[in-house]
Amino acid sequence: MDQPHPPENAETSIGGAPNGFIVEIPTLKSLFIEMCFGETVLGTGTAFLVSNNRESHCALVTNRHNLTGRHQETGKCLSNTGGVPDNIVIHFHKNNDFIGEWLPVRLPLYRSDGSPYWFEHSKLEENADVVALNLSWGGDVRKVPYYLETELDRFGIAIGPAEPVSVIGFPFGYSSTARFPIWATGFLAQELSLITPENPTFLVDCRTRQGQSGSPVLAYRVGNYRKIDGDKLSSVLSPTPIWEFLGIYSGRLNSESDIGRVWHASAVADVLAVATADALRREQKAEGHV
């Protein structure tokens, strides 16, 4: 049994009295969102930030159906008011030394010409229930993204069917405390090797409900876990928690079942790349390069 080297930024929790709550880093990464028409809240959900690494572009990711306000497959309006959102309120962590304070930021979802601000999958487009939003960052919010290309969030944990996975979000808009998310834990319901570029999704067996759409899905391990290192598989005993970002939860297959669909991390990476390319084009245009 191997002893692991710590991943980049081996801290796994943050905060503490008198500077707020002590929470695991993944707890900080799930953000409560409200989908609104004007000032009217139509529904709630979950979002999170993603970036490839600490120096690269950062974007907000959630489910497409959260922003359209319509069922991803049927197109049916999700709100019993019959309304669809035209803006979103994101509850960011305040950028101070106190963990446990939030700053709600309201952002429009559509430009003046009616086109959406969000970015869709480069190949699957509107058929993928994952989108990204570019934001203008100020110093008043704390950015705690999932890093898609570092060992902090992608440690190389080997995960098979029936192993635990966690969906970290806000079922029915509920929180554990204040605006901290709830960890709902279930099991991987298939082999990840069955994921294809044409259908970058996998199934989990987890008791989830509305409001958890857009939640990050993790394999979170304390103690023993299996690690992939090239073509080798080893058993590792870790003194600190380790986690693997797997993807974004998008909802149950059937209202009477606990089987839910997750869009794989590769789909999240795709919409991040689309958002990053647009941000770069706008930056170059502003500088007069194009």
Language model feature labels by segment:
Residues 6-7, 23-26, 219-290:
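C-terminal subregion of chymotrypsin/trypsin-like serine protease catalytic domains
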Residues 28-31, 43-44, 76, 80-199, ...:
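Serine endopeptidase catalytic core focused on the charge-relay Asp
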Residues 20-25, 50:
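Long protein-protein interaction modules used by eukaryotic assembly/scaffold proteins
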Residues 50-52, 191, 220, 251:
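Residue-level recognition of beta-strand microenvironments
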Residues 43-45, 60, 184, 245-246:
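Structural detector for hydrophobic anchor residues on beta-strands
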Residues 63-66, 169, 247-254:
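Short beta->alpha transition motifs characteristic of CBS
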Residues 1-19:
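N-terminal targeting leaders that route proteins to membranes or the secretory/organellar pathways
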Residues 40-59, 259:
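A conserved glycine-rich beta-strand in the N-terminal activation segment of trypsin-fold
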